[in-house]
């Protein structure tokens, strides 16, 4: 719909009157229906151009039965990791003429399911980033809301496409790094209990302990954000550990901030490693050792899988990215005098 020079909105009826056809014919032409005679279609387009008329996106979506929009539900929009996923996904979607609708569940499991259902009703597809809901609930939802793509969560018994990082391997490699520095007393600051990626990290802890019986790792319940890491400092110091692996970079940064306020030197007194390699991890003092996850590529691949589903093509096998260890200044050898 557009506005005439006299301020009145032009409608599909105006175009129909100008072209001498029915409104239904205008609708078919404006939405690319090939059944309309070519000469008639050209007359309609000329009338629309004269009136500066274009069909509204809402009207077009009602006619075509699609919105050219895909919903993305994330558990924590404040986390820069999800920014990277969204950046890659939205850029790739835009290339194919699609838009992204973003919803943040704020780590609330009950809210997550509601958001997924509501946003899916308004969009052509759904991408779930690291959903926190229970496996049975997730599998039921995946069947109800197709097409769906999962990011950083396994699909269980469904055929839903999965794009994820190998958090188990990443954590084992960080533990190996600290082990090679001589650390034998470690702490893992665990993420949200309902987080599947936290479960994979815990698998890494157990696998490492099986191979290194001379090492002790205390698992402390923590969280996923800066404040959680900050608040964990007292428990970390009470553990007498010489090295800490945080659930993610935000937790590691919060811990380092609190340790700094207490006069505890990193890494002289205690080594700290994060996970994800968010954009400012390398600019901390000291720069944060972490496992780098290619989040933008994760988002791009999630869109490619969704595009396959939208076009009724088989989406292919799961894509699992192996994190790359970035050994920086927040980790180092055990200091005997401590």
Question: PLM features: residue spans?
Answer:
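Short catalytic-loop micro-motif centered on adjacent basic/acidic residues
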Residues: 72, 101-103, 127-128, 188, ...
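Short acidic/histidine-rich motifs immediately flanking catalytic phosphotransfer sites
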Residues: 119-125, 238-243
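N-terminal helix-turn-helix DNA-binding module of bacterial transcription factors
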Residues: 1-68, 335
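Bacterial carbohydrate/catabolite-sensing allosteric modules
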Residues: 1-5, 50, 88-96, 143-150, ...
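Acidic, Gly/Pro-rich loop/turn segments at junctions of secondary structure
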Residues: 125-138, 153-159
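Amphipathic helical "hinge" segments at domain boundaries
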Residues: 42, 51-116, 122-125
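Short beta->alpha connector loops
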Residues: 106-109, 129-134, 250
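A general structural signal for well-ordered alpha-helical segments in protein cores
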Residues: 12, 23, 41, 55, ...
